[in-house]
């Protein structure tokens, strides 16, 4: 779990302890009962979830399965707005390379060095890179949709140990 995810979890716990009415952190539905302690306590995290999610977690626990926290509604990214679908792929590529290449490089390094948290870094990418529609941590590739195609940004380790970046435009 990343620092961003830990901060969200701590904020969620604090809001629940304060008695703030909220959506179920697991499914995102407005099914939480008042007072908060009458809901199910999650087996995955020390927070309350709705009764349906509590039942689902109990069934998964019986089957010795888990529903990862990065799939919970509370941890899904809030995507910043972008109007890339109205511009040409070349213009989108220029904008992304100028404004987001450092952030994408940082995320690549995090995914490379800490592959166990790659899904958390992927969620972080959607919040910090406006217009990003897909991100694959391995091999690292970011995709942006444009009016006339898509822009793909890829990173890899070069033979000299440095990081190499490639940017391509694919037509519709």
Indicate residue ranges for each PLM-predicted region:
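Acidic, low-complexity, intrinsically disordered interaction modules
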Residues: 114-160
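Short linker/helix segments within small regulatory modules
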Residues: 36-47
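Surface-exposed polar/charged interaction patches
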Residues: 65-69, 78-81, 94-102, 107-118, ...
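Short, non-ligating residues that shape and space the ligands of small metal-coordination modules
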Residues: 33-34, 56-60
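Conserved short hydrophobic patches within well-ordered secondary structure
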Residues: 47, 55-56
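Short, intrinsically disordered terminal segments enriched in charged and Pro/Gly residues
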Residues: 1-19, 61-101, 160, 164-170
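Residues immediately within or flanking Cys/His clusters that coordinate Zn2+
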Residues: 21-22, 47
């Amino acid at each position: 779990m990343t620092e961003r995810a830990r901060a969200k979890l701590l904020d969620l716990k604090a809001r629940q302890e304060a008695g703030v009415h909220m959506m179920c952190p697991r499914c995102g539905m407005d099914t939480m009962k008042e007072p908060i302690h009458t809901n199910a306590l999650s087996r995955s995290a020390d927070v309350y979830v709705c009764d349906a999610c509590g039942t689902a977690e109990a069934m998964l626990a019986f089957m010795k399965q888990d529903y990862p926290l990065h799939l919970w509604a509370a941890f899904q990214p809030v995507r910043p707005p972008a109007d890339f679908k109205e511009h040409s792929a070349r213009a989108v590529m220029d904008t992304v390379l100028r404004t987001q290449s450092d952030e994408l490089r940082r995320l690549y390094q995090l995914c490379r060095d800490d592959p166990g948290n790659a899904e958390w870094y992927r969620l972080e990418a959607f919040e910090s890179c406006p217009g990003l529609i897909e991100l694959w941590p391995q091999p690292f590739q970011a995709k942006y949709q444009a009016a006339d195609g898509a822009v793909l940004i890829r990173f890899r380790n070069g033979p000299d140990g440095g990081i190499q970046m490639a940017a391509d435009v694919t037509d519709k």
